[in-house]
Amino acid sequence: MDQLRQSLLDAPIIEKGEYQYFVHPISDGVPMLKPELLREIVIRIIRKAELENVDKIVTPAAMGIHISTALSLMTDIPLVVIRKRQYGLDGEVPLFQETGYSESEMYINDVEEGDRVLVLDDVLSTGGTMKAILDALTDEVGAEVVDVVAVIKKAGENELDDTDYNVKTLINVTVEDGEVVIVDAKGDD
């Protein structure tokens, strides 16, 4: 069960401006996502996350969808995708998302007051997306966030550091001198 670690060590690195960025099947959809890697990740999430009495898995589009779908299939917990497109459905809640890379609006549908949710995403980097989602779910919708999981955490400060939100991760990494460095192979609890 070391596919995630090895896949990160093998990940190609690209440069975007002054930023070194790893390209990984979980966070980018390329290179190809092998089923054994996805299976390992879902098993590790099931072992780490608080799933008892969770009503819904909530994930932002787009790169949380494949992980959350696999988790939903394994746990029979319904999946809600926070979309980047507004549909105008009853109960739709907009949220403003700002990361180190972009700004946009996202829209929550099918999460109601009192719902107990697991929030799941592929990567925790600046924390902007995750913080906006958690704030909207708790403050605007009135959902109870039972647990929060990000598969990969990029080392460094993020917007959740000084909040009450606890994000569990499966592995923590950084990029140094054109290579992925494993900071914590077990992630955060």
Swiss-Prot record:
* Species this chain originates from: Halorubrum lacusprofundi (strain ATCC 49239 / DSM 5036 / JCM 8891 / ACAM 34)
Query: Know the name of this protein?
Result: HGPRTase-like protein
Source superkingdom? Archaea
Check the record and name the PROSITE patterns matching this protein: PUR_PYR_PR_TRANSFER
What is this protein's function? May catalyze a purine salvage reaction, the substrate is unknown.
Annotated signal peptide: none
List the molecular function annotations (GO) for this entry.
transferase activity
Query: InterPro entries from the entry?
Result: HGPRTase-like, PRibTrfase_dom, PRTase-like, Pur/Pyrimidine_PRTase
Recite the UniProt keywords alphabetically: Purine salvage, Transferase
Q: What class of enzyme is it?
A: transferase
